[in-house]
A protein has these predicted regions:
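Asp-based phosphoryl-transfer active-site loop
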Residues: 7-23, 215
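Active-site phosphate-binding/coordination module
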Residues: 27-122
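Conserved acidic, metal-coordinating active-site core of Asp-based
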Residues: 98, 102-214, 226
Length: 241
């Protein structure tokens, strides 16, 4: 356990739509985060992205103390992985086969790599799967932490997933299924425990979708200026970095 200085906070930041605007991390955002770090606060990225696609550009601009990736399924403090969770092969195979049946673009995620099925390479990850049944034949070493379906699923399909999985996060245009009970809020709890502080010392900043859990859970939830209505309703504060 590491100590956090008295009266300092752990700031958890979504990436896409929060610190990353689609082209990069704005200079004013990077400067604001640098000031927060200089004042003794801890900065954590808390993202739905797998660790392998949290780019060097983003890491260099934010200079985080840690990274929570793939909706809380992996937590790094510096270079140390303090928590990781993976699906059973049965659950991963079920999800990939389900995506194949639905005829949708599927992304299979681990800390080290992404694998695409029924779609193109994603963010430079050139790993592909032609048939769901070949997942663990082609990638026997893969520890799957999250599976994403890259289009909207019908309510009937979502109901099938929710019968088997605790967290099924349906957004506009994609659906995420992380392992177990992992989400951005459970990650905040684990990081706060690591530093020996309560969640009242956590600030969570987000804009949409899978940020809702952490914005509601943290001691202080902050909605970005571009946030969706549900995030703004759940937040304690509105802000624009």
């Amino acid at each position: 356990m590491k100590a956090l200085e008295k009266d300092k906070y752990i700031i958890f930041l979504d990436i896409d739509g929060t610190v990353f605007d689609g082209t990069g991390v704005p200079e004013r955002t990077a400067k604001a985060l640098a000031r927060a770090k200089a004042a003794g606060h801890k900065i954590f990225l808390n993202t739905g992205r797998a660790d392998c696609i949290v780019t060097k550009e983003i890491r260099d601009a934010v200079d985080p103390d840690g990274v929570v990736s793939a909706m809380g399924t992996a937590i790094f403090v510096g270079e140390e992985c303090i928590y990781s969770a993976y699906m059973s092969k049965e659950d991963a195979q079920f999800l990939v086969s389900f995506g194949e049946e639905q005829g949708v673009f599927v992304i299979i995620e681990s800390i080290e790599k992404l694998v695409s099925m029924n779609g193109p390479a994603f963010l430079g990850q050139e790993n592909f799967l032609d048939k769901a049944e070949d997942l663990f034949t082609k990638y026997p070493e893969m520890n799957v932490s999250k599976v994403s379906f890259m289009q909207t699923l019908a309510e009937e399909a979502l109901a099938v997933l929710r019968e088997r999985f605790v967290g099924v996060y349906a957004h506009s245009g994609y659906v995420e299924v992380p392992t177990g009970d992992c989400n951005k809020a459970t990650a905040i709890s684990r990081v706060c425990e690591y530093y020996g502080v309560g969640i009242d010392r956590a600030i969570a900043m987000g804009d949409s979708g899978n940020d809702l859990d952490m914005v509601k859970f943290a001691g202080i939830g902050v909605a970005m200026g571009n946030a969706t209505a549900d995030i703004k309703a759940a937040a304690d504060l509105d802000a624009l970095l």
